[in-house]
């Protein structure tokens, strides 16, 4: 994957040293972008062995709104262990609910975003509209001396995206995100990959994805997040009857940790192999074939439903994760 190596080289050439919360310096480059045509192959790094099953396990965990490192481990992904159980700041956080807990990270926000409305009791039309939209009253409170009602519902952002792709593909507001200011302090780690926008084209029957990442560890995180984003686009396309096409990947702070430099410099000496193809299991329903809309498969997929065909790679390389 030459685009990945070009990004690494750009950071080495143009990045500036910065200190950060982990205590390991980074070479950082503000504003970076990658773009892939998924009809030409899957964006898997080939200059080292990609931890494909781990990345897919994490994605499946997100789809299931997982908040436990133990549940991620059961899906074949161990990358959350340190953040859950070894980060001193998180261990002292009053919102941590015990060993392996991560708080309402990523998928919890994707699938169960906590939405509240505080409405005047006298605003009967507003209250009725909220109730019709699935909110339920949880309390009556006084606000500025006037009676109000507090209403709540959990918003499944990702399901709403699928429903909109299915029902109104020309909509330009098909997106979800995980940056919930009200719960950031309750998370072991605030979201890095935080905004996903789907762009279906009903004429070509192709669907594209723009992903914005506020901060990306290019040595370890970028290969993971590219895998997850591209696999998610394939899955959404399968469930809605669209072919995955353009995957655009935007990074706010693209950085390389100082102790990752040997690994990345070794990769720069290696020639990338051709891109593999992602294969989805036949058990995942294909809307283009069946004509049956089955969005419940968002949480029913298993890591084994995703495989890479024709994946060639160089020898594995490792580096420590900064926590």
Swiss-Prot record:
EC top class named in words: transferase
Protein source organism: Bordetella parapertussis (strain 12822 / ATCC BAA-587 / NCTC 13253)
CDD domains in the record: TS_Pyrimidine_HMase
Record-linked PANTHER family: THYMIDYLATE SYNTHASE (PTHR11548:SF9), THYMIDYLATE SYNTHASE 1 (PTHR11548)
Residues annotated as binding (6R)-5,10-methylene-5,6,7,8-tetrahydrofolate: 217, 322
Family from the record: Belongs to the thymidylate synthase family. Bacterial-type ThyA subfamily.
This protein's GO CC annotations: cytosol
Major subcellular site: cytoplasm
SUPFAM superfamilies: Thymidylate synthase/dCMP hydroxymethylase
EC numbers on record: 2.1.1.45
Keywords: Cytoplasm, Methyltransferase, Nucleotide biosynthesis, Transferase
Subcellular location per the Swiss-Prot or TrEMBL entry: Cytoplasm
Gene coding for it: thyA
Described purpose of this protein according to its UniProt entry: Catalyzes the reductive methylation of 2'-deoxyuridine-5'-monophosphate (dUMP) to 2'-deoxythymidine-5'-monophosphate (dTMP) while utilizing 5,10-methylenetetrahydrofolate (mTHF) as the methyl donor and reductant in the reaction, yielding dihydrofolate (DHF) as a by-product. This enzymatic reaction provides an intracellular de novo source of dTMP, an essential precursor for DNA biosynthesis.
Residues at which dUMP binds: 21, 172-173, 214-217, 225, 255-257
InterPro entries reported for this sequence: Thymidate_synth/dCMP_Mease (IPR045097), Thymidate_synth/dCMP_Mease_dom (IPR023451), Thymidate_synth/dCMP_Mease_sf (IPR036926), Thymidylate_synthase (IPR000398), Thymidylate_synthase_AS (IPR020940)
Annotated protein name in UniProt: Thymidylate synthase
Assembly, per entry: Homodimer.
Pathway in which the depicted protein is active: Pyrimidine metabolism; dTTP biosynthesis
Gene Ontology MF terms in the entry: thymidylate synthase activity
Active site: 192
Catalytic activity: dUMP + (6R)-5,10-methylene-5,6,7,8-tetrahydrofolate = 7,8-dihydrofolate + dTMP
Any GO BP annotation: dTTP biosynthetic process
Pfam family, one: Thymidylat_synt
């Amino acid at each position: 994957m030459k685009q990945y190596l070009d990004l690494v080289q750009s950071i080495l050439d143009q990045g500036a040293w910065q200190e950060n919360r982990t205590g390991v310096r980074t070479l950082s480059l503000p504003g970076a972008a990658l773009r892939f045509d998924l009809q030409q192959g899957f964006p898997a790094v080939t200059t080292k062995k990609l931890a494909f099953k781990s990345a897919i396990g994490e994605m499946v965990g997100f789809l299931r709104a997982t908040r436990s490192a133990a549940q991620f481990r059961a899906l074949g992904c161990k990358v959350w262990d340190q953040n859950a159980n070894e980060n001193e700041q998180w261990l002292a956080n009053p919102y941590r609910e015990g060993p392996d807990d991560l708080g309402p990270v990523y998928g919890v926000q994707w699938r169960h975003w906590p939405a509240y409305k505080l409405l005047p009791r006298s605003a009967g039309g507003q209250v009725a509209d909220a109730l019709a939209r699935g909110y339920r009253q949880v309390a009556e409170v006084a606000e500025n001396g006037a009676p109000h009602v507090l209403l709540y519902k959990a918003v499944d952002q990702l399901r709403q995206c699928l429903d909109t792709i299915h029902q109104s593909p020309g909509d330009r507001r098909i997106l979800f995100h995980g940056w919930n200011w009200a719960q950031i302090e309750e998370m072991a780690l605030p979201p890095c990959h935080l905004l996903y926008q789907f762009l279906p084209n009903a004429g070509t029957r192709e669907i594209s994805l723009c992903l914005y990442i506020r901060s990306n560890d290019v040595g370890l995180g970028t290969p993971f997040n590219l895998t997850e984003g591209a696999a998610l686009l394939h899955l959404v396309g399968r469930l809605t009857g669209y072919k995955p096409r353009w995957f655009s990947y935007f990074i706010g702070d693209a950085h390389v940790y100082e102790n990752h430099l040997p690994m990345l410099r070794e990769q720069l000496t290696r020639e990338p192999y051709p891109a593999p193809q992602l294969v989805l299991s036949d058990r995942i329903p294909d809307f283009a074939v069946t004509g049956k809309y089955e969005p419940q498969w968002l949480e029913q997929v298993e890591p084994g439903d995703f495989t890479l065909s024709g994946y060639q790679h160089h020898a594995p390389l490792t580096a420590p994760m900064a926590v």
